């Protein structure tokens, strides 16, 4: 990949912002737009074209994350609406991989992903019971939950049915989302510990790194002539 200094600078600013937020230094959120410019620029210089779906995703995620840090309860509808739009928009990118995957044979390969998904669903179910009565709005919560579960499902199933090495990044993407969303709710409604916040912010940082890395390699995955599908 080219221009890796953009990625390194993004990681550096992301780490600085995480520590500043942990010390309750509020101006740290102004670093987030800079981080978005850096990670999107890293994508563009590598693929040599714009990706407006990715730009839309990064913009929605920026709004989601900034207003989560300002006041999640107050801006609950805005945060979850942007989260849902961002997550559903990214299904556009992986859909070509989904269409080419063979789901008709080898269900034994799907056992581990399904068991993992069941474990995640159990954790989410328990978490919903704990926070549900405190949610400011129920109607926006369930579309956001659907978006999260859909994304985790595809991130778990695709690498099991398409063995291309670069698809392994989807496990990290799905895992980052599986950490990010619950920790946002835990921090706001159950346990306002800086440790929980660090987990949430770190997962936000890692999610974008693995996502952009995967999208840079997506054409190579789709055009690969080896029998991975």
Describe the predicted segments one by one.
Residues 1-229:
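Polytopic alpha-helical membrane-helix bundles and their juxtamembrane interface segments
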């Amino acid at each position: 990949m080219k221009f890796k200094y953009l990625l390194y600078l993004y990681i550096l600013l992301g780490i600085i912002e995480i520590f500043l937020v942990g010390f309750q230094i509020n101006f740290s959120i102004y670093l987030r737009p800079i981080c978005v410019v850096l990670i999107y620029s890293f994508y563009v210089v590598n693929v040599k074209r714009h990706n407006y779906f990715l730009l839309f995703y990064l913009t929605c995620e920026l709004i989601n994350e900034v207003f989560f840090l300002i006041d999640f309860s107050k801006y609950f509808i805005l945060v979850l609406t942007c989260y849902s739009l961002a997550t559903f928009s990214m299904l556009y990118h992986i859909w070509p991989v989904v269409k080419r995957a063979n789901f008709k044979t080898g269900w034994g390969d799907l056992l581990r992903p399904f068991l993992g998904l069941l474990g995640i669903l159990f954790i989410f179910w328990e978490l919903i019971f704990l926070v549900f009565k405190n949610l400011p709005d129920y109607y926006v919560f369930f579309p956001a939950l659907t978006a999260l579960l859909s994304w985790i499902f595809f991130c778990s199933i695709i690498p099991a049915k398409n063995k291309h090495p670069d698809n392994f990044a989807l496990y990290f993407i799905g895992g980052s989302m599986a950490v990010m969303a619950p920790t946002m709710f835990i921090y706001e409604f159950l346990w306002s510990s800086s440790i929980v916040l660090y987990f949430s912010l770190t997962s936000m940082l890692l999610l974008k790194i693995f996502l952009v890395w995967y999208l840079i390699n997506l054409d190579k995955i789709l055009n690969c002539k080896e029998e991975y599908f």
